[in-house]
Design a protein with these regions (language model features):
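Membrane-spanning alpha-helical segments of multipass transporters and channels
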Residues: 210-229, 242-420
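Extracytoplasmic/periplasmic domains immediately adjacent to an N-terminal transmembrane anchor
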Residues: 2-211, 408-475
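Generic detector of leucine side chains in alpha-helical contexts
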Residues: 9, 24, 30-39, 59, ...
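Short, membrane-interfacial amphipathic segments enriched in basic
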Residues: 1-11, 344-353
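Membrane-water interface of transmembrane alpha-helices
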Residues: 231-239
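Non-transmembrane, interaction-prone segments in cytosolic or luminal domains
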Residues: 145, 153-161, 169, 194-199, ...
Length: 475
């Protein structure tokens, strides 16, 4: 009989192939499930969102009290449906002044508002009779800085549709009277007024027309998380190169890490606010808003640094990509669209820091409108304080694991003289541990890294990558 082929790593080649296929299959399945689950989650935020446009509330106040004001209601009855925002009529007694309507939209109670101007019908009648009256019958209010893409596609476009249908409703109600009384054939101005009877005035609380507006609540929310993860890998690699976890105690390491994280996120948030401002085009924002945006983003970035620090300390390396990707996806899913048009399940995202950051930024950019500070700041500071309370335990865990790695590496030294005389057998036994490891730069000279020390070192300093531009033998 033919002897079974032996693998250099020990065991038969058949057994090695079997284990390889099992390991590969597990990674294959787990990663497929990871991306399937995360992408299904974020796609779910947009599932049938247009069928929930009725969840957007728009205010209507009739200061006219005549045919023009009634034509707006007739138009809404034609448009009413799940795919159209709900038009909520309020009596003049609640909003006695048109400025009160704007204030209601600014406050965030409504996504938009339409009101019939005082005397709109009589002014239009004068325009039809003499050609000299005002045809500015309606005024509409909206906030272009509040989820700009949805404000443009769902609110602004719906208001434009309402105005167009209001014209048709006006013809239905009043065309016969106008044709009987107005001098349309003799007065071109009267004819023009009849052809375009309803005109509207726009009040956009904060015009946000720049192309980069689509990135504010999407890519810009996830990049800080990825940025902190990459810097954490660099910081861990530098800590490994300089043996910080064994040379300094947990308190000094924690203080050093806190100072470095504050400085890094301070500059990182400045850069993020900087590129938002650099590509603002004609967006009307000032230096005060820049500073407030910078400080808000700084808090958000530091929260994510602390979260990544905690995750990388306690989560096994093989599961860390699952945690980081999932954290990034659920955060961006909480800002990608308004909760009004997402399934109710997603409203748990109110508890996530990215959603609250975006609410703060909208208020800053809207000159104080859409005030959500009563909820946003407590949630963000709760995350920050909770992470500050947990991160010392993560630092202590890293230092203890690094010391254990050093002790494990010093164990086999006593057996060196005994094993040196065994020749080839020793070489074969050392083969599995002969691959390069950053442990060689962490443990003191004269100590040999072992499988256990390598494992512990990876737990203490992982994930990490070597310090760019610095040779390990120089440290």
């Amino acid at each position: 009989m033919t002897a079974a082929t032996t693998s250099p790593l020990g065991g038969s080649s058949k057994e090695v192939r079997k284990n390889f296929v099992i390991a590969l299959g597990m990674s294959f399945v787990l990663l497929q499930l990871l991306f399937l689950g995360n992408l299904s989650y974020i796609y779910g935020t947009q599932y049938k969102d247009s069928a929930r446009f009725h969840a957007f509330k728009m205010l209507y106040v009739d200061y006219d009290g005549d045919v023009v004001g009634q034509s707006v209601l007739d138009a809404y009855e034609i448009l009413r449906g799940n795919g159209y925002p709900s038009l909520i009529q309020s009596p003049v007694s609640v909003y006695p002044n048109p400025k009160d309507v704007k204030a209601a939209v600014c406050k965030g109670d409504y996504w938009g508002a339409v009101y019939a101007n005082p005397g709109a019908s009589s002014n239009l009648s004068a325009a039809l009779a003499t050609g000299s009256g005002s045809r500015k019958s309606l005024t509409y209010v909206w906030n272009g800085a509040r989820y700009p893409t949805f404000a443009q596609s769902a609110i602004y476009s719906s208001i434009m549709t309402l105005i167009q249908v209001t014209k048709s409703s006006y013809y239905t109600r009043n065309a016969s009277n106008v044709l009987a009384t107005a001098p349309l054939s003799k007065n071109p101005a009267s004819l023009q007024a009849f052809l375009d009877p309803i005109q509207a005035t726009e009040i956009n609380i904060k015009a946000t027309q720049q192309g980069t507006r689509v990135l504010y609540n999407t890519v810009s929310m996830v990049m800080p998380i990825i940025q902190q993860f990459f810097f954490m890998m660099a910081l861990n690699g530098i800590s490994a190169s300089f043996h910080l976890y064994t040379k300094l105690g947990p308190n000094k390491n924690g203080l050093l890490r806190l100072c470095v994280s504050l400085a890094y996120t301070f500059i990182g948030s400045l850069c993020m606010a900087g590129y938002i401002w650099a590509y603002r085009e004609s967006w009307d924002v000032n230096s005060n808003q820049f500073t407030l945006s910078w400080m808000s983003i700084w808090l958000y970035m530091h929260i994510n640094f602390l979260i990544v620090d905690i995750l990388t300390a306690f989560i096994p390396l093989q599961f860390l990509p699952f945690c980081i990707l999932t954290w990034a996806i659920i955060n961006v899913a909480s800002t990608i669209s308004p909760f009004e048009i997402s399934p109710g399940f997603y409203r748990w995202g109110y508890a996530l820091p990215s959603h609250e950051l975006y609410q703060v930024l909208v208020q800053i950019w809207s000159d104080g409108c859409e005030n959500q500070l009563h909820r946003a700041l407590p949630i963000m500071f709760s995350w920050w304080i909770a992470c500050l309370a947990i991160v010392p335990f993560a630092m202590r865990h890293r230092c203890q694991t690094a010391l254990a790695a050093e002790q494990a590496a010093s164990g086999p030294i006593a057996d060196d003289k005994t094993t040196a005389s065994q020749g080839g057998s020793t070489d074969r036994e050392a083969t599995p541990h002969s691959r390069a490891s950053s442990t060689r730069g962490i443990v003191p000279q004269g100590q040999r890294p072992t499988a256990e020390s390598i494992r512990l070192e990876n737990l203490a300093y992982g994930p990490s990558y070597p310090t760019p531009g610095v040779r390990q033998d120089e440290l």
